[in-house]
Structure formats: C-alpha cells, structure tokens
Amino acid sequence: MLHHVSIVQNVSIISLGIAAVFQVGDANQMELKSRAIAVHREIPFYIRGEGRFDAFEIFTDEHITIPKRTTDVKLNIVNECPFIEVNNVELRTLLNSGCFQIGNVDYGFNNSRIIQIRQYITDEPSAQ
C-alpha cells in the first residue's frame, strides 16, 4: 500500500450518520456496518421484543457477496510526491456506513441495512 501524508487546511461537516467515517490519512482496512429497524404506526405504541434483527431476513449477512481479494497484479510505482493536499472540504451530510477519506485505503467494506415498516389501522392513510 502506498503511504501518503494528507494535509487538509479547512474542514466543515454538518452531519455524520451512524457508522459514518470522515478520515484524513491512510488506513489499512475499513469495515463500516449499520443496521436499523424503523416502525411507523398510525397509533404509537411499543411492543416488547419486536426489534429483533434476526426476525428479518434483510439483516442476515448470508446473501452479501464479497469479492475475494487477489494480488495477481504486479506494480512498480514511483511516488515522487507523497503529499495529498486539500484546501477546503465542505460536507453537508455523510449517511449511514458512508466514508469520506483523503488518503489511501487497502480494503474497505461498507454495509447499511435499514427496514422501514409502516402500520396503519385503515388500508390507506387518510389524506388530510
């Protein structure tokens, strides 16, 4: 992995989501995961034990295909200037499991799973 010296003059961030990363500099590996269950009801009430991730198929990692890493490529790189210079970064929002990096990363894995459940008393919500 190439090594750099990252220089950032000014950073402005308004909001970072769950498991979001803003990184200046090199990283060996990054594994960002977030999971959420959002239940919207017409009449608000809480049912004990309803927020179990294993009850929903979307939260199992069995269906995620992660490519296998291969190192068959031979490189000869001359890094004449190891500096990464950035003047200004303005970031409004970085959502769940998002990554903004100034630098090098050898391996990154980002996974965000959110299920939204809407429960209404009537078949269709009233348009008032």
UniProtKB/Swiss-Prot annotation:
GO BP field: sporulation resulting in formation of a cellular spore
Transmembrane segments annotated in the record for this chain: none
Induction of its expression: Expression is sigma K-dependent and negatively regulated by GerE.
UniProt keyword list: Germination, Sporulation
InterPro entries from the UniProt entry: Spore_germ_GerPE
Role noted for this protein: Required for the formation of functionally normal spores. Could be involved in the establishment of normal spore coat structure and/or permeability, which allows the access of germinants to their receptor.
UniProt protein name: Probable spore germination protein GerPE
Organism: Bacillus cereus
Gene (name only): gerPE
